[in-house]
From Swiss-Prot:
The keyword Membrane applies. GO terms for cellular component: cytoplasm; plasma membrane; vesicle membrane. Belongs to the MtrD family. This is Tetrahydromethanopterin S-methyltransferase subunit D. It is found in: Cell membrane. The gene is mtrD. It is a multi-pass membrane protein.
């Protein structure tokens, strides 16, 4: 077990970095929860973990697809990032259409008087008794940034786990077509998803309900979540590396 840990210390470090990126990314995603579902709060009307996991897992799938054709890490991370950003962007666009044309409210934030990006007044359009509604531009941009960071984090975790399995007994040296369809893909994906959920849940306790994006006062709490996720990711990395190494890459 000690040999497995020492032999894969670099990949464990990358897994930990990926987990920290995932945790940080959650704070960028505009989460409105149940109030947003009723257009009584700014953000997307679902939970923190669901949104983060949706974007991150889409990025993981994109990264896995890219690994069919190349073992270039920057390209794999870019693919995962873009995949996650597209997913969260489409989610926010559809949500905005429903809020504007279905509910009939103007996307606006109750956290700031002026949108930091468009400089449009927000307080004039916030309905009485609500904490904003819809997805103003600043929340949209923040969500895309969060999706990108989460996609990079998830891709980094998945790539590292694949490499751990490769070094544990598979013939191929890098991540190439020979990995496609192999059982190692399933095992690495399971661990990557697990690590992603762990690091998505921790910030949800830190946020405590809803958050509009990087302009929200709650965003300043991110260092606490990042430190907690750093510790959790180290533990997850140890378990994942030891398990995959003991299985000999399946």
């Amino acid at each position: 077990m000690i040999d497995a840990i020492l032999g894969n210390i670099i990949w464990m470090a990358l897994i930990t970095i990926g987990g920290v990126l995932i945790s940080w990314s959650v704070h960028f995603v505009p989460v409105g929860g149940a109030p947003a579902a009723m257009a009584q709060a700014t953000g997307i009307g679902t939970g923190t973990v669901q949104l983060a996991a949706g974007a991150g897992l889409t990025g993981l799938v994109s990264a896995g697809f890219m690994m069919n054709v190349t073992d270039n890490l920057p390209l794999i991370l870019a693919s995962g990032s873009v995949g996650a950003m597209i997913m969260i962007a489409v989610t926010m666009i559809v949500g905005s259409i429903v809020y504007v044309y279905g509910v009939g409210v103007v996307p606006s934030s109750a956290k700031v008087k002026v949108d930091p990006i468009t400089k449009y007044r927000q307080d004039l359009y916030v309905s009485q008794g609500t904490e904003g509604h819809g997805l103003p531009t600043v929340s949209y941009v923040s969500g895309i940034i969060g999706g990108g960071l989460g996609g990079i984090g998830g891709s980094l975790v998945y790539y590292s786990l694949i490499e751990v399995g490769m070094s544990a007994g598979l013939e191929a040296v890098g991540v190439t077509n020979s990995v496609t369809g192999h059982e190692l893909v399933a095992v690495a994906a399971i661990f990557a998803i697990g690590i992603f959920f762990v690091n998505a849940v921790i910030p949800s306790y830190n946020i405590g309900g809803t958050i509009e994006g990087f302009h929200d006062p709650k965003f300043k709490k991110w260092p606490k979540a990042v430190v907690s996720s750093l510790v959790a990711s180290i533990m997850c990395a140890i378990v994942a590396v030891v398990a995959i190494a003991q299985l000999g890459g399946i």
